[in-house]
């Protein structure tokens, strides 16, 4: 049975001290109230990674992820951070393909595929984000849109490589808006994603892929979201920045 994955994307929030304090509070909670059925991954800003990594011990069931990395392992890329650098400070996961990276930095499926290769080459796990804008959903083209994102970003991977990928379905129109698809729509989309993978790979692999839902997840809807049989967890944004709300989410598992 897969654990429920709770991935917390802090985005560009919290200064160094604020981020470290929040991470300390979360680790103290996990030590006091172990969550046997959950896998918790924090995705703070780059400035927090090393400090938070020092809080992690075998007793603290908390994992560390980065919000981005470069597609090359090293070189003259001013301002960039490589997957190899992240691996050196105990980062285990890297977000890739998030809609904010696609929209604000013009990252396309080809670049995302290269980033995934770099992440895997450093023995890290990619958390691959896919999702459609509202205009695509309203024109009933969302299935084809998601299939193209997956095909161009993931289909070059071997089955063994694909098994290392976590997929996060985040409809763009639901991110930070308070809007959320119906439970039936979320369940339908996760099944669509699995069907896409079945056609390219095989049923066993597709059925065992970890698929998360992201987009306006919070304490009021977490129980319903994680009750969906095909959803293996959630990717949380704003709600993960507030200790009390995040703990409420964890206690709902």
Swiss-Prot record:
> Which Gene Ontology molecular function entries are recorded, alphabetically?
triose-phosphate isomerase activity
Gene Ontology BP terms: gluconeogenesis; glyceraldehyde-3-phosphate biosynthetic process; glycerol catabolic process; glycolytic process
Main localization category: cytoplasm
**E.C. number, please?**
5.3.1.1
- Which GO cellular component terms, listed alphabetically, does the Swiss-Prot or TrEMBL entry include? cytosol
Q: Which residues form the active site?
A: 98, 170
Q: Write down the superkingdom of origin.
A: Bacteria
> What pathway is this protein a component of?
Carbohydrate biosynthesis; gluconeogenesis; Carbohydrate degradation; glycolysis; D-glyceraldehyde 3-phosphate from glycerone phosphate: step 1/1
Cellular localization per UniProt: Cytoplasm
Q: InterPro entries, from UniProt?
A: Aldolase_TIM, TIM_sf, TrioseP_Isoase_bac/euk, Triosephosphate_isomerase, Triosephosphate_isomerase_AS
- Entry keyword annotation includes Isomerase: yes
- Catalytic activity entry: D-glyceraldehyde 3-phosphate = dihydroxyacetone phosphate
Q: Binding positions for substrate?
A: 9-11, 176, 216, 237-238
Pfam families in the cross-refs: TIM
Recorded hits in CDD domains, A to Z, give: TIM
Report the enzyme's class at the first EC level. isomerase
What's in the keyword line of the UniProt record?
A: Cytoplasm, Gluconeogenesis, Glycolysis, Isomerase
HAMAP family to which the protein is assigned, alphabetical: TIM_B (MF_00147_B)
Q: Which family does it belong to?
A: Belongs to the triosephosphate isomerase family.
Q: Tell me, how does this one assemble?
A: Homodimer.
Q: What does this protein do?
A: Involved in the gluconeogenesis. Catalyzes stereospecifically the conversion of dihydroxyacetone phosphate (DHAP) to D-glyceraldehyde-3-phosphate (G3P).
Q: What is this protein called?
A: Triosephosphate isomerase
Per the UniProt record, the source organism is Amoebophilus asiaticus (strain 5a2)
Q: Gene of origin?
A: tpiA
């Amino acid at each position: 049975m897969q654990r429920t994955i709770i991935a917390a994307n802090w985005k560009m929030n919290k200064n160094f001290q604020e981020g470290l304090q929040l991470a300390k509070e979360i680790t103290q909670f996990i030590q006091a109230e172990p969550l046997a059925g959950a896998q918790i991954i924090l995705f703070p800003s780059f400035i927090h990674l090393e400090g938070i990594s020092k809080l992690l011990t075998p007793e603290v069931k908390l994992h560390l992820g980065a919000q981005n990395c470069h597609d090359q392992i090293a070189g003259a890329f001013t301002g960039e951070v490589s997957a190899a650098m992240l691996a050196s400070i105990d980062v285990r996961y890297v977000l890739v393909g998030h809609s904010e990276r696609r929209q604000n930095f013009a990252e396309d499926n080809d670049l995302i595929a290269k980033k995934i290769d770099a992440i895997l080459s450093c023995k890290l796990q990619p958390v691959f984000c896919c999702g459609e804008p509202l205009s695509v959903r309203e024109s009933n083209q969302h299935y084809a849109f998601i299939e193209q994102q997956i095909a161009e970003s993931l289909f070059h991977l071997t089955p063994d490589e694909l098994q290392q990928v976590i997929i996060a379905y985040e409809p763009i129109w639901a991110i930070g808006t308070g809007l959320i698809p119906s439970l039936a729509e979320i369940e339908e989309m996760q099944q669509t994603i699995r069907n896409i993978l079945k056609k390219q790979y095989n049923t066993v692999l597709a059925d065992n892929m970890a698929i998360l839902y992201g987009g306006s997840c919070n304490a009021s809807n977490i129980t319903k979201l994680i009750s969906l049989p095909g959803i293996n967890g959630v990717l949380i944004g704003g709600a993960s920045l507030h200790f009390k709300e995040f703990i409420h989410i964890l206690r709902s598992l």
